[in-house]
């Protein structure tokens, strides 16, 4: 084998030498020079190419790139200076073309040196190579893994980019936001593009004009499990941000890089969720050329079997690691050369001994690929081991022998830290740094100078572990974990054999965490400023409170030390920070904070800009929108109403604090805003208070605000009462039987005891109608969901808005009666859907309705229950004379929908019809709407007492929920919403990135538009 290898190499050397010395028999002769890429322009039909040929080129070769075979010759012609035309074979748009010119070097002169210099031997046999190269290679161009040239590494996407004093932020809660920080004391949002909940990866294309192009990478999903990635090019100019072009790419986004104007996307595609016979997947590495005001142009792609693609890159190389199908314990790594014409695959995929889990665990340098992986299992079971491997990967420009090395492509391997889990890796020159954790918690320094024999140069045992390493010359800055909190460290690695921990500082109390522990882009290290910034959040288990800050750290490269400095407080989890001039700008998804750091021990907050806020309800008042945040312990926000222009929900004009507690209902009537708040003594009042026995202070408060006299609502009056433990609103809105008497209905059912017997413990609450209940401990064997208290009606009197009153709670029935959530009120009457479980037949219930008479003053009158043929789903035409009750009976094979006439005391079945089992249904007026596969089925109740079919509404899907409100039918499925007039045939449809739309809070505006709250993602006004 050895003799064959030498023989082949000898023949190659002879061949190359012969090529070089052709025509050199005389003292002066023409000689071929180097090769150069020539300008090539394809025709529109891609069947011809025009190549611009400069003087000094002797031949032109046109090549095309094949994914499996690399660059292959198509045509070669003798060069003619000017423009040469080549005919091309038919090929798809994904095929790349290039033209190579062979340059005439001119004449070879032997006048430079004495003639005796040129009389020596000029042909040589193969000799043993040096350890770094491994086998001879002739380098045609200096592109061998970052060892030459001034190329910069491809850029990685982030949630924001800072360009001078302008910040571009892809906010998951809102979309693109552009902020001007020329005056840090007065930052301003200058442009925005609503695009929430679809991604956060952003690039800023190079440019210097006022108009800039931002690249936003977003994701979309089909109803059948498929996904795609969308490239959005956004033009930002003159206070506007608008999408100028888009391009969809198959698969979900996993990683990306931007090299100049070439976008490289790594996406994963799974087999069709519903029709797949196997769960195989593949990853797609696609290239796209980007330019302002142009559609992204496809520039090549590579398909790799496997998923979870992970990119590592350097100035002239890119590595892609995937999990091969069916394997999570190893990785397949493919290396590409980055060239002006795109990516060139340099070798077949290499399978690593373990799984590569991070982008800092791969490097290509000096024609060697180095990977660091973790192998978790061996013959004895779980036994994590870190494995470093070196593979031979030649640059495309290197001419090399057919047989590179007798040992194959794998040059060397190093196993270390058996029994330890791999936490951090980083390369710096010919050194690799590795951090593991479990038993001895070491930092390893690995010498890579001999790729065939990587060795541990030294190691240091330290407590805790590091999750990210940042080389700073012969220092190593690290962020990690120790003693249940985030820690920062600085190591001296000037002597690889003896690394030293110079300083470690704890960044918070136990329970502190940081996004930088899993995403190093959250950490900002500025060596030139001697500054590091890291976002921190701390949860206090005793108080239930969370705090968020950006911690400043001094990194003194001269003194080789690390020092803790001041903090910049955030109301919400900070995610990024940077230094703009003398100001630290830090950002969360809710707020941007600018702070002066002249004194790093005491940063001075200069300004705060609100970027996003939750919207749980939207109301329209006097040409404005009232955006209501419910508040509560989760998320850290308080109950607030914010005022915006009716057509610009993101432009907040004023805001009002609604006080403690959580908003449970809100309504706007006659220029007044009515807010129902629940004020709890514990965090989770609705469900756990009967168990904890700590809800004695729970109460409901009704607040009345004037919305006519000022831009911001002004509080007029308030009243409250104790609601009792376990109380929850049975109907999610205020009921108005009289203009001055709003009502709420309370239920006392436990919602979260799935499959458990209910346990009753002490309940010390004193209600308005009874003294303290006696202590009751033990197990109640009532069926699941049976309330322990009777449902109650609470009436308010708002005749005097400055002094509203609350009446005595009224029981709506005996304990054991449950409410189904349906309630309507009008003309002095309230109708509430009720049921009682049938103990003799599990799963069935007696359905009924409770009617309550309410006059403008005095006590309410509770009428007897009205038996209903099914569960109440809607009430229409309600007045003192009666109402129409629409009910349903669900079965395994079909659902029966019914209409009954009620006189206030009895229900008389009018007609019924069958619908698909478990189909969503609702009613409005005398029409019933049912979701089917074909759309929305419509039935109208005629004067003859029968249901009559109307044309089907085609909405394009089967809605999961339907609702009639204000004469409009609305329906939703996942992220899709539609609307149609109850008596109309025209359908308006929308799709959103936010999923599971809650129809109960969608309301019509005065002109018929829909006002939709999206919670954390804000609000939208949908034009109809």
Residue spans for each PLM region:
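Beta-sheet-rich non-transmembrane sensory/scaffold domains
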Residues: 96-1024
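Bacterial N-terminal signal peptides
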Residues: 13-24
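Initiator methionine at the very start of the polypeptide chain
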Residues: 1-2, 30
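Short intrinsically disordered, low-complexity segments
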Residues: 9, 21-22, 29, 53, ...
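Low-complexity, Ser/Thr/Pro-rich intrinsically disordered linker/stalk segments at domain junctions
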Residues: 30-112
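Bacterial N-terminal signal peptides that target proteins for export
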Residues: 2-13
């Amino acid at each position: 084998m050895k003799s064959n290898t030498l023989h082949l190499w000898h023949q190659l050397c002879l061949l190359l030498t012969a090529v070089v010395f052709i025509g050199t028999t005389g003292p002066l002769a023409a000689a071929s020079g180097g090769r150069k890429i020539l300008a090539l322009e394809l025709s529109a039909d891609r069947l011809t190419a025009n190549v611009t040929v400069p003087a000094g080129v002797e031949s032109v070769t046109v090549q095309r790139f094949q994914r499996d075979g690399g660059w292959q010759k198509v045509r070669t012609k003798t060069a003619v200076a000017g423009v040469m035309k080549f005919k091309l074979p038919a090929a798809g748009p994904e095929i790349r073309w290039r033209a190579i010119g062979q340059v005439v070097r001119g004449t070879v002169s032997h006048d430079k040196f004495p003639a005796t210099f040129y009389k020596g031997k000029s042909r040589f046999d193969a000799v043993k190579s040096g350890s770094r190269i491994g086998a001879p290679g002739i380098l045609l161009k200096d592109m061998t893994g970052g060892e030459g040239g001034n190329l910069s590494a491809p850029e990685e996407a982030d949630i924001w980019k800072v360009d001078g004093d302008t910040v571009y932020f892809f906010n998951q809660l809102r979309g693109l936001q552009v902020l001007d920080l020329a005056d840090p004391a007065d930052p301003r949002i200058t442009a925005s593009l609503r695009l929430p909940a679809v991604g956060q990866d952003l690039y800023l294309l190079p440019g210097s004009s006022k108009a800039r192009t931002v690249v936003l990478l977003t994701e979309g999903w089909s109803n059948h499990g498929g996904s795609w990635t969308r490239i959005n090019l956004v033009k930002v100019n003159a206070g506007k941000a608008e999408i100028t072009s888009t391009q969809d790419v198959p698969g979900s986004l996993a990683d990306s890089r931007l090299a100049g104007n070439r976008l490289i996307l790594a996406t994963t595609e799974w087999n069709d969720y519903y029709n797949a016979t196997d769960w195989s997947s593949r990853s797609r590495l696609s290239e796209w050329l980007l330019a302002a005001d142009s559609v992204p142009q496809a520039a090549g792609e590579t398909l790799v079997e496997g998923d979870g693609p992970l990119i590592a890159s350097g100035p002239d190389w890119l590595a892609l690691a995937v999990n091969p199908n069916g394997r999570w314990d190893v990785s397949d790594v493919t290396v590409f050369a980055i060239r002006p014409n795109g990516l060139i695959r340099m070798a077949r995929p290499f399978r690593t001994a373990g799984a590569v889990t991070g982008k800092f665990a791969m490097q290509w340098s000096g024609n060697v690929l180095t990977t660091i992986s973790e192998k978790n299992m061996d013959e004895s079971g779980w036994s994590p081991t870190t494995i470093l491997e070196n593979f031979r990967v030649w640059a495309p420009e290197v001419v090399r022998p057919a047989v590179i090395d007798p040992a194959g492509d794998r040059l060397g391997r190093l196993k270390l830290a058996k029994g330890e889990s791999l936490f951090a890796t980083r390369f710096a020159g010919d050194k690799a740094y590795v951090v593991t954790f479990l038993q001895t918690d070491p930092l390893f320094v690995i010498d890579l100078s001999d790729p065939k024999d990587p060795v541990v140069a030294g190691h240091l045992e330290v407590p805790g572990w590091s999750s990210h390493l940042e080389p700073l010359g012969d220092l190593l800055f690290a962020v990690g974990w120790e003693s249940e909190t985030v820690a920062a460290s600085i190591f001296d690695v000037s002597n690889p054999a003896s690394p030293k921990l110079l300083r470690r500082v704890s960044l918070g109390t136990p329970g502190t965490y940081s996004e930088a522990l899993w995403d190093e882009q959250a950490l900002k290290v500025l060596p030139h400023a001697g500054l590091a910034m890291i976002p921190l959040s701390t949860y206090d288990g005793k108080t239930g409170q969370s705090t968020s800050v950006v911690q400043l750290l001094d990194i003194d490269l001269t003194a080789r030390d690390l020092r803790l400095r001041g903090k910049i407080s955030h109301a919400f989890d900070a995610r990024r920070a940077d230094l703009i001039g003398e100001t630290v700008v830090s950002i969360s998804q809710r707020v941007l904070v600018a702070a002066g750091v002249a004194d790093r021990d005491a940063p001075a907050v200069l300004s705060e800009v609100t970027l996003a806020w939750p919207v749980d309800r939207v109301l329209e008042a006097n040409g404005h929108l009232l955006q209501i945040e419910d508040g509560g312990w989760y998320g850290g926000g308080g109950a607030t109403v914010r005022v915006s222009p009716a057509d610009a929900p993101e432009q907040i004009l004023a805001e009002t604090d609604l006080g403690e507690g959580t908003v449970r209902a809100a309504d706007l009537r006659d220029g007044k805003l009515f807010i129902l708040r629940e004020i709890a003594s514990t965090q989770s009042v609705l469900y756990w208070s009967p168990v904890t026995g700590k809800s004695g202070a729970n109460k409901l408060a009704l607040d009345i605000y004037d919305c006519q006299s000022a831009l911001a609502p002004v509080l007029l009056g308030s009243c409250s009462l104790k609601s009792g433990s376990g109380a929850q609103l049975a109907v999610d809105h205020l009921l108005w039987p009289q203009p001055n008497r709003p009502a709420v209905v309370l239920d006392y059912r436990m919602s979260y005891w799935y499959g458990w017997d209910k346990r009753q413990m002490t309940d010390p609450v004193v209600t308005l109608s009874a003294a303290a209940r006696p202590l009751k401990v033990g197990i109640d064997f009532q069926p699941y969901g049976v309330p322990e208290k009777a449902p109650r009606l609470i009436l308010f009197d708002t005749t005097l808005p400055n002094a509203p009153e609350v009446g005595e709670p009224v029981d709506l029935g005996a304990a054991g009666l449950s409410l189904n959530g349906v309630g309507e009120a009008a003309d002095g009457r309230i109708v509430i859907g009720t049921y009682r479980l049938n103990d003799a037949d599990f799963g069935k219930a007696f359905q009924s309705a409770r009617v309550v008479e309410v006059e403008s003053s005095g006590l309410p009158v509770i009428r007897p229950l009205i038996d209903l043929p099914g569960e109440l789903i809607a009430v229409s035409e309600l007045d003192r004379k009666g109402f129409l009750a629409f009910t349903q009976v669900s079965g395994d094979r079909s659902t029966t929908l019914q209409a009954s006439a009620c006189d206030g005391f009895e229900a008389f079945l009018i007609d019924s019809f069958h619908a698909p089992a478990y189909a969503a249904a609702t009613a409005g007026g005398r029409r019933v709407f049912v979701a089917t596969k074909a759309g929305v089925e419509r039935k109208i109740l005629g004067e003859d007492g029968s249901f009559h079919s109307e044309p089907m509404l085609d909405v394009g899907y089967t809605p999961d929920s339907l609702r009639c409100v204000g004469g409009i039918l609305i329906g939703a499925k996942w992220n899709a919403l539609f609307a149609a007039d109850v008596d109309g045939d025209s359908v308006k449809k929308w799709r959103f990135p936010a999923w599971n739309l809650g129809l109960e809070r969608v309301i019509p505006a005065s002109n018929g538009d829909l006002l939709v709250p999206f919670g954390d993602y804000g609000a939208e006004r949908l034009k109809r």
